[in-house]
Amino acid sequence: MTREENVYMAKLAEQAERYEEMVEAMKKVAELDVELTVEERNLLSVAYKNVIGARRASWRIISSIEQKEESKGNENHVKKIKEYKCKVEKELTDICNDILEVLESHLIVSSASGESKVFYYKMKGDYFRYLAEFATGNPRKTSAESSLIAYKAASDIAVTELPPTHPIRLGLALNFSVFYYEILNSPDRACNLAKTAFDDAIAELDTLSEDSYKDSTLIMQLLRDNLTLWTSDVHNMEKNQDGDDDQNEPGM
């Protein structure tokens, strides 16, 4: 199939909510080693986001059930749950490794514009973060380090190439701050990053283009929601150092 035909099939698969097939179609486009259009880039991102998102949701539900069964002392159930969770983790690992290979071998090397470089390095950071979410020990440490390097690479380019109100720069700040909060357990750094991104965007709100107004303001709202949640968590931890360290899921 031609590039155009694969893009059409990806759109068709998206409409039919057959995201695995959407991934396959967009992988073929990515493997042409050409600069993707904004539309193609977004189709690729949506395809993988849906495929990984379903498994991430499954993993969270299974983990929650596992905790409940462990607290009840149901050893037989816990054994079955752990086996099932391993199956989901294998799927998560395969999907993450798949897109990371596409990014490393095709997309990052073929990207010419600052915008696309930020987009792809952000994606790289995201998928290493997803690996770190369920990994333990050394694999978690390695994934977290790789995620941090990718997010920093994206940030360095974003600061010089994209305005503070650009939705890709704001989306990067959102996800990078979530990484600090959830993976590195650094609420202060998470809050500082989110607040700086939000304040910088507010200061230049009058320069926001009509095209990206909706996307940018939505991400700014998510940054503010997370800040509200995280600052209250930090405040509670300071008030009660020996308290429960359960953390709410930040809005993303």
Curated annotation (Swiss-Prot):
Transmembrane region(s): none
SMART domains: 14_3_3 (SM00101)
Superkingdom of the source species: Eukaryota
GO terms of biological process kind: adenylate cyclase-activating G protein-coupled cAMP receptor signaling pathway; chemotaxis to cAMP; cleavage furrow ingression; cortical cytoskeleton organization; microtubule cytoskeleton organization; positive regulation of cytokinesis; protein localization; response to bacterium
GO cellular-component term (any): phagocytic vesicle
A Pfam family reported for this protein in Swiss-Prot or TrEMBL: 14-3-3
GO molecular function: myosin II heavy chain binding
Family: Belongs to the 14-3-3 family.
Protein name, UniProt field: 14-3-3-like protein
The organism of origin for this protein: Dictyostelium discoideum
Gene: fttB
